Design a protein with these regions (language model features):
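ATP/NTP phosphate-donor binding region
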Residues: 16-98
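C-terminal charged capping/lid subdomain of soluble metabolic enzymes
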Residues: 183-185, 283-335
Length: 336
């Protein structure tokens, strides 16, 4: 059986490709720094049918059928999923076939859930094109859609065969989208790997946008944090909840803003909020609270939200999937 040379998978010979194993219910690897089209060939061989799912505005040059879904959070609805199911049926995909998800976190969330639910589970490969997708949405096997009651309330755990991270996608992103993705990277620094925060010391958003070596190091470290946590607690029964740092308020802000605020922007605000709350409770030092503000402001991320919205935000947070017995629960940190 032909296998693609690992050397030919490299997007840029100046860097070494990084591989991060994820030992979930089905072990797979996250490949970072590869040429996604070359790496994808390994997964296309021997497949009778392959269908790609991507967003409406996205153009991909693949000689396979492509299902388009609406851009942004509008693509994560029951109505969109129903249409995807219809198209999968028209293409007559069966359990031996493959779904390829090419896009940001909303695409990998929706496509992964389509793969999880079609014929009770078929294979899929994630090709994230945003930083948020690379370090968060595409890694860990969480798939799903939103409902009228909140974000990500309907879904399944269904790991991909592989996650293929081609860093050249970052050049296609706006500064705002780079910043939003970096919020998830910063989160990994605060919850687990302080080296991420050290790498970002005295770095601006422009530095992150232009420094490919820095991108590789940051994404590799953030993926490694999530992979280690997911490998220990795949179905979020205890440790994995730490990945929701900043997300309880963050998800509420997204919903309140009708998703005008990016996921990462909302998470940045959520991290500042819980850092302040932790300091009030006496479990986090003022210096670490200030470090939140320094890093997030340097990346041009928001650190506050409209005060008058708080009653509505409390209502949304009560519906958060981490809430128990009617109590809103936050993930907090006490140190790095």
């Amino acid at each position: 059986e032909r296998k693609v040379s690992r050397r030919n998978r490299f997007r840029d010979s100046r860097f070494f490709m990084r591989t991060v194993p994820v030992n979930a219910e089905r072990a797979y690897q996250v490949e970072i720094g590869i040429d996604w089209k070359v790496a994808l060939n390994d997964w296309l061989e021997g497949r009778n049918k392959v269908v790609a799912i991507t967003s409406a505005s996205f153009q991909i040059d693949l000689n396979i059928p492509v299902i388009k879904i609406p851009d942004g959070e509008a693509g994560k609805s029951a109505e969109v999923l129903l249409q995807v199911w219809r198209e999968l049926g028209q293409y007559e995909l069966n359990r031996g076939d493959l779904i390829i998800a090419v896009g940001g976190g909303t695409v990998t969330d929706l496509a992964g859930f389509a793969a999880a639910s079609w014929m009770r589970g078929i294979d899929w490969v994630a090709i994230p094109t945003t930083i948020a997708g690379m370090v968060d949405a595409a890694v860990g096997g969480k798939t799903g859609i939103n409902s009228e009651h909140g974000k990500n309330l309907i879904g399944a755990f269904h790991s991909p065969l592989s996650v293929l991270i081609d860093l050249s996608w970052i050049k296609t992103l706006s500064e705002r989208d780079v910043a939003a993705g970096m919020a998830e990277v910063v989160k990994c620094g605060f919850i687990s790997d302080g080296n991420i925060l050290d790498l970002l010391k005295n770095k601006s958003l422009k530095d992150v946008c232009n420094d490919e070596k820095l991108q590789l190091e940051l994404i590799h470290k953030a993926v490694s944090v999530k992979a280690a946590i997911v490998s220990t607690d795949f179905k979020e029964s205890f440790l994995r909840e730490i990945l929701n740092y900043g997300h309880t308020l963050g998800h509420a802000i997204e919903k309140h803003s009708h998703f005008d605020i990016r996921h990462g922007e909302a998470v940045a605000i959520g991290m500042c909020f819980i850092a302040e709350l932790s300091a009030i409770k006496g479990i986090l030092s003022p210096a670490l609270v200030e470090r939140h503000y320094e890093i997030l402001k340097a990346l041009k991320l928001p650190i506050s939200y409209e005060k008058l919205a708080f009653p509505d935000l409390l209502t949304y947070m009560a519906l958060d999937k981490k809430s128990k017995n009617g109590q809103i629960r936050f993930v907090a940190i006490s140190d790095i």
